[in-house]
Amino acid sequence: ELIMATYKEIKGVTIQTLDSDPVVGGVAGASWSSGGNLNTAKSASGASGANNSAALVFGGQPGNKTDTEQYNGSSWTELNNLNTGRDYLGGQGTSTAAIAFGGGTQSETWDGTNWTEGNDLNTNRDTLGSGTLAYTEGFAVGGWKNPGVASEVESYDGTSWTEVAEMNTARNGPFLSGDNTNAICSGGSTEPPVVANAELWNGSSWTETSEINTARYNGGSAGTYTGALIFGSNPPASGVTEAWNGSAWTEVADLTTARGYQDGAGAANTNAIYAGGYTNTAVANTEEWTAAPVTA
């Protein structure tokens, strides 16, 4: 008699049993896998990138870093530094065309080779939510403006930042997916408490929508307003990952290394990257998220 080993016996992990196809949160066959380590362990950095084979990480801690590293799908290469060292900043765009903002009021644009100083944010803040798509449609949401939690929202048009309608809930360290025309903002801290509520942006106003399953903040995000991915948090360090399908949040495979205080990148909830972050110290490891999109 031939006895087949189960997936659990082979992999030694707990898996979720589903009644039909293994599809959760609008993604199928989803998992995190290890990628190449950053050259320098860091947290509180900004990040940008279209997918897990082309990304950029810049700034961060310890110290107000100026470091910039670019990922090619297997390894990180150090490139030209930011003009202004800072931490707890956000980033948006790709590995060759991006914007870094926050961790103060400064913003800088990246052309694939160099950083150029651009127009400042209107509100000085850090640990803000940053968009995940093209840098010319930048979006800066919430954060910490010392003193107090920020509800301010700013939209970038490729040249300057403009204040737009504030969120219903002021929040520090929120998750943001999308751009300045359509986005979803979730989680964050109201100092206290940590919240689970989420809001949708339609280009002019915010509307409350379904809450995330686990209230948390200071993690990474990827995707769009109809297909988002949020992952990690700190404190406490968490690997929880949730996918948004346009109407509900579903918990999917956790990060291998629980961590937070780091920006994530990825233009879709099927392909994302999380590099660096903070557990009880800054880390250098990279994790790549890959999932199959669900089609009708």
Question: What is each PLM-predicted segment?
Answer:
Residues 1-296:
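Polar, enzyme-active/binding microenvironments
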